[in-house]
Structures are given as C-alpha cells and as structure tokens.
C-alpha cells in the first residue's frame, strides 16, 4: 500500500506508530480495568502481577517484539526504495507511545468506590497505574527505540510521546 502510494505521490515523510499491539496492550488495559472493577479497595486484585499480563513483558517476548518492529521498519524502507526513493529522499518518524493514564497519585478520583471508573472513566488501581507508567510503557517504548536503532535506517527520527498527555 505504501509503495503504491509513494510511486504516484511525493512522499517526504512516513510516520509509524508500532509495537503496542505486539505487547497486547489492549488486553493488558482490559485486565487492569477488570481487576479494578471486580475487587474491593480493601483487597485489590492488581493486574501487574497477573500471569497473562506478565507474559507480555518477559525478556524473550521483548526481544521478539523488538525484532518484529525492526523488520517492519525495514519493510517500510524497502517499499520506499521500490517506489524509487533514495534513502535520503524521505524521513522515517517512529512514534513512542503516550501514557493514556496518570501515575497513581495523579488520579482525580479516589481508588475506593467506583467513581474513578464511573465518573473519571479510568478504573485502575494506583499500583497498576504506577506499574503501567513505570514498567510497561518504558518497556514498550524501549523496544520501539531499540528497533529503530537496530534497523540502521539512516536519518530515522523518534517522536517521543510518552509524556504527551501529562498535565
């Protein structure tokens, strides 16, 4: 699709957001919200220690995802070459992932009761939010950054979005 488009248009930049789905990010978020809604504040069930969540962040999986991202970026470069572009004739921009939630202390609503979910729209335990911001997101973004380096694509840029929603 990119190659076909680039053949008939003057493409100067390709922006890529990649990797989150390979860490099953949506399933992780779903687990965190489910654990928040299904456990009381006096006995919270955290998602960060669920086996299904932890499996996404093993060193083996991190390395595999990093390699997949690198290969996808190389495919982008090859598509541009096939469309007739010199490597210096376009720029690859790879986005890191923004944090969709604050750290635990940054929530507007208490984690006791359901107002954090029903009013605030973000049912996460503080510990899970801290884990997401302090471990999961840096791991995902580290894999993205590493894959850009591993790809060796000259002139590739990284657009750092991790803190884009802060404040």
Each PLM stretch: what is its role?
Residues 3-167:
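Alpha-helical cap/lid subdomain in secreted, periplasmic
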